Regions:
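Aromatic-residue-lined binding/catalytic grooves and analogous aromatic/hydrophobic interfacial grooves
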Residues: 1-320
Length: 320
C-alpha cells in the first residue's frame, strides 16, 4: 500500500490475483447519523455505569443514545487485477517474499526451464500499482490481464492506447444510495513482443519484459464534498506514472518508504532461523521462542501502518 491505494498479492503462478483497494471507496454517501437526543441521556447513562447498573445503562444507551438512521457506512473493495499466464499451472522452485525493507512483494518460480519473477509495488511517489514481469530468457512474457469488481453495475471498457477502464459507484447501504464514484485504469509497457487490448482484456505476447500499471481514483474530496472527477484523476495518476522507467519508479518508492521505516530499529539478537520460512517460524515459535521473529513482527506492524495511512489521506481502517 501507499496510504491511498492497497494491493494484496495472492501469488498464484497460473493466475495472479491482486485485490485492489482505494481509501475513499465506502458504501452509501456522506451523512450524519448522530442521534439528536443523545446529549440529553448521556449523563444518565454515565450515572448508571458508575452505580454498577450496567444492563440498565446499556439498555438506555441503546434506546436513547445510539443512531436511529444507520449504523455507519462500510468500507468497500475496488476489485481485483487478474493476470493469466498460459502454461504456468505446472511450476517448480516456487518462492514468495514480502520485503519489509523495501515495501515490495516478490514471486519467483520456474516453468519448463525458464525462471519467472513478478515484483509488485504500490508506489508512494507515483500513486499507482506496478507489477514488473521478467524472465531469464527473452520473449517469454505472455499474459492476459483484466480488472474485475464486486460492484454489480461496474462498467468495463477498452480505450485507445491499450488501456482498460473499470468505472462504478459504491453500493446502497441501509437505505442510502451509493454516491462514491470511482474509476480504475489498466495498461502496460512492454519491451519486445506484442501488446493489444480487446473487450476489456489487456494482452501481451512474447515480450522480453513488461510492467503493468493500475491507477484508481474517486470523486471524494472530503467528508461533505464528493464532486471530484474520478476519471481525470485516474488519467492523471497514470499518465504521470508512465513517464518514469520502472527502475526509477522503484528507487523513488523505496527511498520514500525507508524514510519512515528507518526511524526505528529493534534488535533482539541474531537470526538463528534465517533459512526457515516465516509460516514455519510462526508454527514453531512455541518451542523456539524465536526472538528475531518478534522483531520482524514489530516491523511488520510498522510496515502496515506506513502503507495504510499517509499524511493528507484517510486514517487506517479495518484495524480491529
Amino acid at each position: 500500500g501507499n496510504g491511498r491505494l492497497g494491493a494484496m498479492v495472492y501469488g498464484t503462478p497460473g493466475i495472479e490475483q491482486i485485490q485492489l483497494n482505494e481509501e475513499t471507496i465506502w458504501a452509501g454517501r456522506p451523512n450524519n447519523n448522530a442521534n439528536p437526543n443523545a446529549l440529553e441521556y448521556i449523563l444518565k447513562v454515565r450515572e448508571l455505569i458508575f452505580a454498577g447498573k450496567y444492563l440498565e445503562a446499556q439498555t438506555l444507551a441503546t434506546e436513547k443514545v445510539m443512531a436511529k438512521t444507520n449504523s455507519g457506512m462500510p468500507y468497500q473493495s475496488f476489485g481485483d487485477l487478474r493476470i493469466a499466464f498460459p502454461g504456468h499451472t505446472r511450476y517448480s522452485d516456487y518462492y514468495r517474499e514480502l520485503s519489509l525493507d523495501s515495501a515490495r512483494a516478490i514471486v519467483r518460480y520456474e516453468v519448463d526451464g525458464v525462471q519467472y519473477q513478478r515484483e509488485t509495488i504500490t508506489s508512494f511517489t507515483d500513486q499507482v500499482v506496478m507489477v514488473r514481469l521478467t524472465a531469464n530468457r527473452p520473449g517469454q512474457i505472455t499474459f492476459n490481464a483484466q480488472l474485475t469488481s464486486p460492484h454489480q453495475d461496474a462498467m468495463i471498457n477498452s480505450e485507445e492506447g491499450n488501456c482498460v477502464t473499470l468505472s462504478g459507484v459504491s453500493s446502497l447501504h441501509e437505505g442510502l444510495k451509493g454516491k462514491v464514484e470511482f474509476q480504475g485504469r489498466l495498461t502496460a509497457r512492454n519491451q519486445g513482443g506484442k501488446i493489444a487490448c480487446t473487450d476489456g482484456v489487456l494482452s501481451v505476447e512474447g515480450a522480453d519484459e513488461a510492467t503493468i500499471y493500475v491507477s484508481i481514483a474517486t470523486n471524494f474530496n472530503n467528508y461533505l464534498d464528493i464532486t471530484g472527477n474520478q476519471t481525470e484523476r485516474a488519467k492523471s495518476y497514470l499518465s504521470e506514472a508512465l513517464v518514469h522507467p520502472f527502475a526509477e519508479a522503484k528507487k523513488n518508492h523505496v527511498e520514500f518508504y525507508r524514510q519512515y521505516l528507518t526511524r526505528v530499529s529493534l534488535d533482539l539478537g541474531e537470526d538463528q532461523y534465517k533459512n526457515v520460512t516465516t509460516d514455519k517460524r510462526v508454527e514453531n515459535f512455541k518451542d523456539t521462542h524465536d526472538a528475531h521473529l518478534v522483531a520482524t513482527y514489530f516491523q511488520f506492524g510498522r510496515y502496515l501502518l506506513i502503507c495504510s495511512s499517509q499524511p493528507g489521506g484517510q486514517p487506517a481502517n479495518l484495524q480491529g
